[in-house]
Structures are given as structure tokens and as C-alpha cells.
Amino acid sequence: MKRSSLVDSCSYSRIFRSIFCLLSFCIFFLTTTNAQVMHRRLWPWPLWPRPYPQPWPMNPPTPDPSPKPVAPPGPSSKPVAPPGPSPCPSPPPKPQPKPPPAPSPSPCPSPPPKPQPKPVPPPACPPTPPKPQPKPAPPPEPKPAPPPAPKPVPCPSPPKPPAPTPKPVPPHGPPPKPAPAPTPAPSPKPAPSPPKPENKTIPAVFFFGDSVFDTGNNNNLETKIKSNYRPYGMDFKFRVATGRFSNGMVASDYLAKYMGVKEIVPAYLDPKIQPNDLLTGVSFASGGAGYNPTTSEAANAIPMLDQLTYFQDYIEKVNRLVRQEKSQYKLAGLEKTNQLISKGVAIVVGGSNDLIITYFGSGAQRLKNDIDSYTTIIADSAASFVLQLYGYGARRIGVIGTPPLGCVPSQRLKKKKICNEELNYASQLFNSKLLLILGQLSKTLPNSTFVYMDIYTIISQMLETPAAYGFEETKKPCCKTGLLSAGALCKKSTSKICPNTSSYLFWDGVHPTQRAYKTINKVLIKEYLHVLSK
């Protein structure tokens, strides 16, 4: 009886254990299944491992039926947990770009890495998870986009601290080596001025007239109008008095030089003249000459008509010279001589001595003619001389008028040293008539050029504004003949020379200084050379 009751109690206990285990298993199974179902409704990702505890939202979002991309394996596929809990579900991780291949080992030190941009905090609660890109490759470029890595450069120098205005350096390439400071080159010596081009339009130049163009023709004449002694020529080449009426070069020298023909014009009557000098032109002028024959006779100078005779003799000499077979100038005889004369430039100056010496210096002409009729006679004589030059073959002829003669030192009024306006009026009257006659000749004679060259205006401007031309003294001559008066020419023994010849406009009582001649003829060449060289 006892044994059967014991057996029954054991059986019941086994039954209860079995039932208890079955119930426990059912409860555990139901509990686990319901929990997974509920979690999948509220959390679309696998239950385990849970990234971080999330509170259940009041309105669970509807899962997106589109297929979810599978994150590539690797450490970069897992989403990185933010520093703290957020009320929004974290978006799916974006596929990260593949890391670049490891660079080959190089003996050069690698540049320091650039600091990475800070992570941007997640946006506030999107209603739906962001859709991934349909094509995971290529990954979106981060901002700012780094420039492409340049080719490796061997052994760069380490990066220097940033300068105030740094240049952009590639992130993976070596910084460029700084250029060495250039060594300052020694200052070069000023190059010598290039030689002047040879003149090809004017083969020769011929000068006629008075002392403005005389380069020594009066030296062998029996005349008092000479300048072949000191102090004349004190600033000339080799400081030699050559018979030029100035302290150096005169107008004929500068005109020939600026035309590109020759540096110095020889006198035709110079006994030392060379045949080669004849081919480029000479001077026939004589100090004291004038258009009026009476003027040259009074000064015992070479009259203007005699200068034409010398010009004819010159043409014959040149013709004989070019016919010589052994001459270095292989010209074609007379035809080439005619071309030399026609292409050359003939320049005439006169009228000053006709007014100063013949009209205002003596009373004979003033008794016969008034100033108007006398200037007409002188202008007609100038036109006759030009016509005879044309007859000898000259086709390019320039005629220089008279300067303001009343303002030269020897003709100023003695007491106040002011200009003689009566003499200036006579100069202007003669110049106006000369200009009119030359204009008529240009229209009448074919294939010719007649140019009136105005020096009255140039010298008047130099007298009015001497500082603009670099002159200080315009009333007194540099070469004086006495304490209170200025003679026409410098004397050999009694003349006193000014300390600075370049600051004086006039050298003696009539003629300009070398610097004044240079200034005057520069203006003449600038204004009239393009007409004469046509």
C-alpha cells in the first residue's frame, strides 16, 4: 500500500515536471516570436546586434518596399555611432570610397597629412530614410574636392611655414623648390650711338651767299672782312681759325651735317681741297657779299655773279673727275654730273649786307630809293640769281631770308641797347617780297623746288625767350672790341672773350655763336628738309 502510493507520487511529480517544462518552452517560444515580429515592424534592420537602444516612436514609419543595398564588407561598412542618443533613426551608411593603394616606399619623407574635415551632424528627423544612389560607384566626391595627386617628384624639400601670400601646393606632391635669388648683373656700359645712315636722296650740297656760309673763301682775298685769326675758330676742330665767322662751325656746316651729306663743308677756293670733297659739295659764299653788286665791291668780296662763275667751273671739274678711269667713283661722265647737280641741294643766303652796308650804312642809296623800292630791287636780284642756278641744272634750291638785323649787337641803338626797328622793318619787307617771288618761280619752272627758309621768326623767338633755348646774353657779343661799343668783327689783339661762349647768342657784332648756329639750323632742317628732298 505504501509502495503504490510512493509510486503514484513519483509519477505525478514527473508528470508535473513535464507539463511545467512544456509550458515553459511554449511561453519562451511565444515570447521570443512575438518580440521578433514586433521589432521587425518597428525596426527594419536585424534585431541583433542592436546599435544603440532606441525608444519606440509614437508613429512608426512605413518601411520602404524598395530593396536595400547591402553594405560592402569591411570595417568601413558599419555605421559609426554618434556621440550621443538622437530621437531619430540613423540613416543607412553610405558606401565609402576605396582607400587609395599604398604608395611605393620612397626615400623621401612624406608630407604631413592634411586635417580631415569635421563630421557633419545628422539632420533632424527625416520622415523616411534617405534613398541610396542607384549606382554605388563612383562614390560622391567629398567637399571640398582635393586636386588630383601629381606625379611623384624625387626628394622634395620639407614644407616651409606659410608665407604671407602662399602659392597653392598639391596635397600629395612635393612643394616646388624655391628659385634661387638672381645675382644682380653688373650695370652695362652705355652702348655707343649707332652710326648715322648714309644719305641716299641728297648726293651733294652747294652754298652761295655771304659770311653765314663762308668757310674760308675770303682767306686769300685782299679784303678786310676775314676771320682766319684767333679768337675765331677757338671752339672749332683742332682749335684752328679756318676763315669761318664764328667761334666754331657755321650754318653751312650744320646744314650739310643734318642733311647727312658731310660733316664739314670745304671752301671752293681752299688750296688744300681734295677731289673727293668736290663730289659731295662745297661753299662758294664770301663774307661781305650781297645781291647788289655795289655791296660786294664795297667789301671787296666775291660778288654773287662771280660765285655762279665759280659754280660753272666746279661743274667742269667734277665732269673731268668722274671721267677718270682710276677714280674710285665710277660714274658715267657728263650724265652722272648732271644728276649730281639736279639731285643736290643749292642753298643761298643774302640781303643782310645789302641793307646794313649799302642802304643804311651810306647815304647814296637812301637818296636814290626809299626802303620799299630798294627792297624790291634786292628781291629781284635774288630771283635772277636763282634763275641762273636753275639754268646750270640745279632743281632743289633753298633761299634763306634776312634775320632781325636791327637786333644784332652792332646795329642796336647805342644808348639803350634796344633794337633798331627801322632796320627790322626793312628785313621783314625784303623777306615778304622774296617769299612771293619764290612762290611764283615754283609754279612757273617745271620739275623744280624753290623753298623760302625763314630765320627771322626763329631768331626773334630766341631774342624774346632766350632761357627757353639755353641762352643768357642776347644783346652783347661774346667777342668785344671796346668798353661801350661792339664792332662788326673781333680784333686780333684788343678783343676780350666771354667766359662761356655757349650762353651767348652772338659771337661778334653780327654773327651768331657756334651753339646759336646749331640751334637755328636744327629748326631749319626740321621744317624744310622734307620739302627740299622731294
From Swiss-Prot:
CDD domains registered for this protein in UniProt: SGNH_plant_lipase_like
Matches recorded under Pfam families: Lipase_GDSL
GO molecular-function term, one example from the UniProt record: lipase activity
Segments for region (Disordered): 59-202
Active site: S211 (nucleophile), D508, H511
Signal peptide: 1-35
Keyword annotations: Signal
One record GO biological process: lipid metabolic process
InterPro entries: GDSL, GDSL_lipolytic_enzyme, Lipase_GDSL_AS, Pistil_extensin, SGNH_hydro_sf, SGNH_plant_lipase-like
Annotated tissue distribution: Found in sporophytic and gametophytic cell types in the anther, only in male fertile plants.
Domain of life: Eukaryota
Family designation: Belongs to the 'GDSL' lipolytic enzyme family.
Protein name: Anther-specific proline-rich protein APG
Organism whose genome encodes this protein: Arabidopsis thaliana
